[in-house]
Amino acid sequence: MLNLVLMMIERVGLIVILGFLLSHIKTFRRLLHKQDGYVDKLKLICIFSVFTIVSNYTGIEIAGNTIMNENWLQGVSSSSTIANTRIMGVGISGLLGGPIVGIGVGSIAGIHRYMLGGTTALSCAISSILAGVITGYIGYIFKKYNRTITPKFSAVLSVFIVSLEMIMILLIVEDGISIVKTIAIPMILVNSFGSFILLSMIQAILRQEENAKALQTHKVLRIADKTLPYFRQGLTEESCKHVAQIIHRFTGTDAVSLTDTEKILAHVGLASDHHIPSHSLITGLSKEVLHTGKIMKAKSREVINCQHEGCPLQAAIVIPLTSHGNTIGTLKLYFKNPNQLSRVEEELAEGLAKIFSTQLELGEAELQSKLLQDAEIKALQAQINPHFLFNAINTVSALCRTDVEKARKLLLQLSVYFRCNLQGARQLLIPLEQELNHVQAYLSLEQARFPNKYEVKMYIEDELKTTLVPPFVLQLLVENALRHAFPKKQPVCEVEVHVFEKEGMVHFEVKDNGQGIEEERLEQLGKMVVSSKKGTGTALYNINERLIGLFGKETMLHIESEVNEGTEITFVIPKKVGEEEQIVKSISS
């Protein structure tokens, strides 16, 4: 028995090595995280079927009490049986891939085992299929209830499944008792041990990747948080100097440089003696990035093409900084050792460049809003609030350590939110669908900060989504409700948004079940800015002024509220307002 255990452990080592190699393939790791449709499930079935087929071929043939020491089985005599590690592959596939993958792998493993022959061919084939069904549905239940499958659980489950196989042998094979006495204990021990090792290794590699992504995201967000005040000032030598110092401190690169389209704005680290701020660009790589607008990397001085002969910088990645689709500068990370420029550094640089480009657009939008004082309506449009960005960054940063996928989705919602801010700040009217996207992005971020606190229901007629509306009106009304309508301890905070057509006008209603507004304050809201601990009413005043300025007094806000009952804000606008250019002309005339 001991010899059989030792020989089977050798086979486990082969399967573990195969699993280790596969775990370092990006596609395999992605499939374990998420299967998008039947094609991905088919890929997993093929991969894990290889495990089981290898296990069948490397099984140990046993004829009576004699162990046949063959490295690769071509077939099994009708009087022999096989002790193998097939259940490892079937069990892990079901736990990680679910019912379809488990049943698929179990069926292939069972059919292949049956084709090899032997006294236990039929019983092993049936038990393989049953193993796929059982582990597949257990994996599905664990995933449904968001529970983690531990290696210990996998080992215990393997004991049960191999025991089930032994029962099948007893039921089907004529001399099953002697076979079970020979192979039961070795197969139970080795398969449970192998399942524990294989799942532990796969999960460790996946966890290592998740931790690396979380740390990388956390690093990017910290840099973004630190650099935001400077990028709001635009691409100036002073602001870029502080930004370069922050990036250099947090990334550990040998040098960091920022440029505009003509000159170096800041350079921190090695080669500062000839990469001098305010001097013209001296690397051909930077000029090429500015010309093409594409990310470029170099792993030699020749490719960097620095005009200074003694430049110690041997590798670089140069990323374009963009604003509204135009390249306005570059971010450059330099290294003195080409081996330091790995895929991790490339992804870090790409992430920073995207965030910096957004920050530059935010700064430009803020500057332009200050220059539009001659346009009264545009001056009333909502300004970008940096405090909201700080709160959102802190929320995503916290999620990076607990839920990387949710943090990624929130980053996308944050991008949508600020894109809507930027677009809205330059337009008098936008499609209702764009405004609803703005509202949804804001809600996603707020609900991430305060889980299960707010319930927002939206009732929108589909044919009205192309109607032109003033930007920010719904978003600010929903934000106003979430911030001011509810006392801290209110258990159910509900907001309803209704948009419908009636008599050629588009009607908007925003209702909440909050604490309501006192009658004295209610008379002032929307008509003036008021002083209060609960807020100044600036958002409602701005919305009201914009509606009146665009469509006339008949479209002004109507606010109804009862203390401890809730508030309802309504307004109407014409449905067929035409193109934005026509509206602008009619207003200016």
From Swiss-Prot:
Keywords: ATP-binding, Cell membrane, Kinase, Membrane, Nucleotide-binding, Phosphoprotein, Transferase, Transmembrane, Transmembrane helix, Two-component regulatory system. It catalyses: ATP + protein L-histidine = ADP + protein N-phospho-L-histidine. It is a multi-pass membrane protein. Residues 235-360 form the GAF domain. GO terms for biological process: cell wall organization. Pfam families: 5TM-5TMR_LYT, GAF, HATPase_c, His_kinase. This is Sensor protein LytS. Its main location: membrane. The lineage of its organism: Bacteria, Bacillati, Bacillota, Bacilli, Bacillales. It comes from Bacillus anthracis. GO terms for cellular component: plasma membrane. Disulfide bonds: none annotated. The gene is lytS. Residues 360-577 form the Histidine kinase domain. It is found in: Cell membrane.
